[in-house]
Amino acid sequence: SEHGNWGMDYRDAVSCENFINEWVEAVERDFNHPAIIGWCPFNETWDYKGRRQYDALIKTVYEYTKEFDHTRPCIDTSGNFHVVTDIYDVHDYRGEFDEFRKSYERLVTHGELYEHVLNDNPGRQKYGGEPVFMSEYGGIKWESDKQYKSWGYGNDVKTEEELLERYKGLTDAIIDNERMLGFCYTQLYDVEQEQNGLYTYD
């Protein structure tokens, strides 16, 4: 279960208070739900509009979550910057699957993770040998209807077949990597400003 917090101002005491109350309520409410396989209180808490990620808050919320539910793994903040986490998750939207595959080969051969957030921020993002989860990938630009403005990563595909080929290449690269524990493709459906799904709302 990932909680909505993107763009939250960590300098605002009211925002923090509201977030913590909502998170505690969600964990206590959903603890016994069989669909919950893990917890993730934050998403992409990189430095935003000059606001540095608030590591102390992330660590505190992680520790509360683990104290309340020690039976499930907890990802502290999805994508970055990890502070303390049970699973090291990655967001990678590179569209060329050969490059995508090669960048994770050292995970199998040497137990080392080579991913852009870690490499661009070695002092802030650290890999400690945790299981690796590709929690966001894809985002392939696909314009099924030219009257709507599409958005996505990589060179846009022209046909459904081309989109499926790229999807398969990226997904196979993850499945074939024995050190990846799972994946979540984003996304199969158009959502709001991200008009790059294979399917539309209707």
Predicted regions and their residues:
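Substrate-binding clefts and catalytic carboxylate motifs of secreted carbohydrate-active enzymes
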Residues: 35-39, 63, 84, 101-202
